[in-house]
A protein has these predicted regions:
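C-terminal scaffold of the Radical SAM
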Residues: 1-3, 22-45, 49-329
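A short, conserved structural fragment
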Residues: 343-353
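Local cysteine-cluster metal-coordination motifs and their immediate loop/turn environment
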Residues: 9-22
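Auxiliary N-terminal substrate/complex-recognition segments of SAM-dependent methyltransferases
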Residues: 100, 212, 336-337, 363
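Short amphipathic alpha-helical interaction segments
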Residues: 329-341
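Minor-groove-contacting beta-hairpin "wing" of winged helix-turn-helix DNA-binding domains
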Residues: 354-358
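Short, amphipathic alpha-helical interaction segments positioned at domain boundaries
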Residues: 362-373
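Short active-site neighborhood of thiol/selenol oxidoreductases, capturing the structured segment around
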Residues: 4-8
Length: 373
């Protein structure tokens, strides 16, 4: 499988925890120039590129007006062979959803929408700097259903300061009541330079302790599994195995192109990234130049170790023969000693030809992964 990621670097406002590259309308209002430049980048992709998955992220894709969304989707169809696409996703924010935008998505082939709820707790939403509230999130979800989308993901954030265990479970219960096909349940990360990180460093925010975070994580896991959700990746749950195929491609070492400012690609043994500057990105493409700002030639063994770590994020683990066919390296030859030690410690499990994290290691996976790379 191969994938296409498209980065829309526009947000209505800046969330207090986010360090993704984006600009607000006050900083950049020439959407037409961005869309023209994005189309020029599509034209630079290999002519035989035919992705299996497409993911439009950001930023906030639904910060685009409906007409602009249609222009972007039309340019994708004009320049990229979508005949193999089985999943075409777009992110959306509750505060910028409209029936017109959803109609444009539907008409343009989008068949999966990921809505950035983050919490159904209004106090938590204010702390995160989100522009919507719980009622708006629920209304946005129902708007998606009314528009005919039958594959919907809800994003939630865990470990939000001030959230009591009962608040955390209330968020999970609300998800179970809405019954989306998929839930992404990400840990709050304090990125350098963000307002929330400054508040934490200066003592205005106190994150929950590790034990409380772990208890909440496993309580949510149990609640969702009791409601019919399969826990298929450390931070992801799905009903009826409606996994996010685009992310599965990432986790299993697949190749992909990224378009848009700051987007990254992995193709033919190289990793490359576009410049994280919207103005320079547009200037370069308008001049017929490449927006690529970074190229890394991947060492095959390093890439195999990276793929091992990503693949182990999936709860079913990996088939070691399949892993070898994908990477050209057997797991035991890459890091057999470290794997043996972690099996003895109960962090990894090996059953016949399959290697996986133990259930107890799900919340401490980073310490496991650091031993494997």
């Amino acid at each position: 499988m191969t994938g296409l990621y498209i980065h829309i670097p526009i947000c209505i406002s800046r969330c207090r925890y986010c360090d993704f590259y984006k600009m607000t309308p006050n900083e950049w209002d020439n959407v037409a120039l961005f869309l023209q430049s994005l189309e020029l980048e599509f034209q630079r992709l290999p002519k035989d590129f035919a992705p299996d998955t497409v993911f439009i992220g950001g930023g906030t894709p639904t910060a685009l007006e409906a007409a602009d969304f249609s222009i972007m989707l039309d340019s994708i169809h004009r320049h990229i062979d979508l005949s193999n696409v089985v999943e075409f996703s777009s992110e959306a924010n509750p505060g910028s959803l409209t029936p017109e935008k959803l109609a444009a998505m539907k008409e343009g082939g989008v068949n999966r929408v990921s809505i950035g709820v983050q919490s159904f707790n209004d106090k938590a939403l204010r702390l995160l700097g989100r522009t919507h509230r719980a009622r708006g999130a629920i209304e946005g979800y129902h708007m998606l259903r009314e528009a005919g989308f039958d594959n919907v993901n809800i994003d939630l954030i865990q470990s939000i300061p001030g959230m009591k265990p009962e608040d955390v479970l209330a968020d999970a219960r609300q998800v179970a009541e809405l019954r989306p096909e998929h839930l992404s349940y990400y840990n709050l990360i304090y990125e350098p330079g963000t307002p929330m990180t400054r508040d934490r460093d200066e003592g205005r925010l106190i994150p929950p302790g590790d034990d409380e975070e772990a208890d909440n994580y496993f309580a949510v896991k149990k609640l969702l599994e009791d409601e019919g959700y399969g826990h298929y990746e450390i931070s992801n749950f799905s009903r009826d195995r409606k996994h996010c195929l685009h992310n599965v491609l990432y986790w299993q070492g697949g190749e992909y192109f990224g378009c848009g400012p700051s987007a990254h690609s992995h193709w033919k043994g190289k990793r490359f990234g576009n410049i994280p500057d919207l103005k320079v990105y547009c200037d370069r493409l308008q001049k017929g130049e490449s927006p690529v700002d970074m190229i890394e030639v991947l060492d095959p063994k390093d890439k195999a170790r990276e793929t091992l770590v990503m693949w182990l994020r999936m709860t079913e683990g990996l088939d070691m023969d399949h892993f070898q066919s994908v990477t050209g390296h057997h797991v035991d030859m890459l890091c057999g000693d470290a794997i043996g030690s972690m099996i003895e410690e109960g962090l990894l499990e090996r059953l016949e030809n399959r290697l996986a994290l133990s259930s107890g290691a799900l919340f401490v996976c980073n310490s496991v992964f650091s031993e494997l790379v």
